[in-house]
Design a protein with these regions (language model features):
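A short, Trp-centered hydrophobic/proline-enriched beta-strand micro-motif
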Residues: 44-51, 102-104, 189-191, 219-225
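Glycine-rich, N-terminal phosphate-binding loop and its surrounding beta-alpha-beta segment
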Residues: 50, 57-120
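An anion-binding catalytic pocket shared by soluble metabolic enzymes
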Residues: 58-65, 114-123, 195-282, 293-299, ...
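Conserved hydrophobic core element of enzyme catalytic domains
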Residues: 323-434
Length: 434
């Protein structure tokens, strides 16, 4: 079975396993901690989710599905995973979140677009950062031939859908639309605009090289890979460990300073800046409104703090909660279900969602595909972590399509927004053109 479904097909009618042999045996065993789950991955087609050296990395495909477009793509993905996980015979000696069968996913930003994909890797390494490491395998354990890594070479850069001058025009039109809405009593307050950039290398781009470079340079971010989508996102959309849930909301950005004093001054100015704090408040409110009804407890920090990355500072707010107990015969919301419930946040779409989405489609003149959509993993217990696919690129052979953007409010300046987007391209540009 290919695992690829067409519109109108749930993908649940047949055997979800690519081997086509029905239920598979899954085994998770504790192994010595190597200190790096990204070291020595045998092939370029990998899945990964790593932060501070802890996380998951795997290869091969035991099962795969590409979901049809639609608002129900998260629900369809959950149903397919439940069908797959229920037919596995599991031996789990570790019993932590991320052990047993695990699926990785990358979902489209826009429900009207195709391309949301779930992959269950055939081999998966895990490490919790507290001295425990494990290996999960589907079926018999074999020896995978190691394909040598090849760093990108001969990289050439090309403009994407909107070259810089036209993107500045799009930002100006967004600002005008927001101001007009305010004058006329409308509800549009923020829209997030993005642009793309292409890189072409002399040979197919190896995701393993990019992952290691990103993880080394941005340890505070979540370095990820799934179906050719590779990046290092600073934004945790949702994490679920049993009933405990958490998120990290980011919106509002300024550069790092050249000296400690300059850096502190830039950070203080960001915390006091009306445009950026307004943008951040919309993002926090959207998370509260979507996650709050699903929780019996929800704690949101009273004000943003600074998240300092190597090249940028962001306004950040931590959100923590406890899921509401399910009713009779019900079950807790899974990590994937929660990701679907909170996406898209105002941090990547705008306020209100529907109006902002319409303006994005009008002004960006491109398909974001899976940029700014949920990316992450979920295990058979429904635990998992999903980030927002930012600071990333979609790999396709010798080509990489990079994305970056920012939140536009009434006080936004097109030239400043372009400069911010250029800085947000830097992690992937540096990883590709080391």
């Amino acid at each position: 079975m290919s695992g690829v479904v067409s519109a109108g097909d749930t993908g649940l009618g047949g055997d979800p396993w690519l081997a086509g042999t029905g239920p598979l045996t899954v085994r998770t065993t504790e192994v010595p901690d190597s200190g790096d789950v990204l070291a020595g991955l045998p092939e370029p087609a990998v899945v990964a989710w790593v932060r501070h050296g802890a996380g998951l990395a795997g290869w091969g495909e035991a099962a795969r599905i590409t979901l049809p477009s639609g608002e129900d793509r998260f629900t369809a993905g959950e149903k397919w995973l439940r069908s797959a996980f229920e037919t596995t015979v599991v031996t789990d000696e570790v019993r932590l979140p991320g052990t047993g069968p695990v699926a990785f996913g990358t979902f489209t930003f826009d429900a009207s677009c195709d391309g949301s994909t779930l992959i269950v890797p055939r081999v998966l390494r895990g490490r919790d950062g507290h001295g425990r490491a494990w290996l999960t395998t589907f079926g018999p354990v074999g020896t995978d031939r190691v394909q040598p890594e090849r760093p990108p070479a001969g990289v050439r850069w090309h403009d994407g859908s909107l070259p810089p001058p036209r993107w500045e025009q799009a930002v100006a039109r967004a600002v005008a639309a927001i101001k007009a809405s305010d004058r006329e009593g409308g509800s549009l307050r923020k829209v997030v605009l993005s642009r793309d950039l292409y890189a072409t290398a002399a040979e197919p781009i190896d995701a393993r090289v990019l992952l290691r470079r990103l993880a080394s340079r941005y340890p505070d971010c979540y370095t990820f890979a799934c179906d050719g989508m590779v990046g290092a996102t600073p934004e945790l959309l949702i994490q679920r460990a049993w009933r405990a849930v958490s998120a990290l909301v980011l919106a509002g950005t300024t550069p790092r300073g050249g000296t400690a004093a300059e850096d502190d001054a830039l950070g203080a100015a960001l915390l006091a800046d009306a445009k950026n704090t307004e943008e951040h408040a919309y993002a926090v409110a959207s998370m509260r409104d979507s996650l709050g009804p699903l929780c019996e407890e929800l704690d949101i920090e009273p004000g943003p703090v600074l998240l300092k990355l190597p090249n940028l500072q962001h306004l950040a707010t931590h959100v923590r909660g406890k899921l509401a107990r399910p009713g009779p015969g019900g079950s807790l919301r899974s990590a994937l279900g929660l990701a679907g419930a909170v996406h898209p946040t105002a941090a990547v779409c705008g306020t209100p969602t529907g109006t902002a989405m319409e303006l994005i489609r009008e002004l960006e003149q491109m398909d974001r595909e899976r940029y700014a959509g949920p990316v992450g993993w979920m295990d058979a217990s429904g635990n998992g972590e999903w980030g927002i696919a930012l600071r990333c690129a979609q790999l396709d052979g010798r080509t990489a399509r990079l994305f970056a953007g920012g939140g536009i409010v009434a006080g936004s300046d097109p030239e400043a927004e372009l400069a911010e987007a250029q800085v947000k391209f830097r992690p992937m540009r540096n990883a590709l053109d080391f």
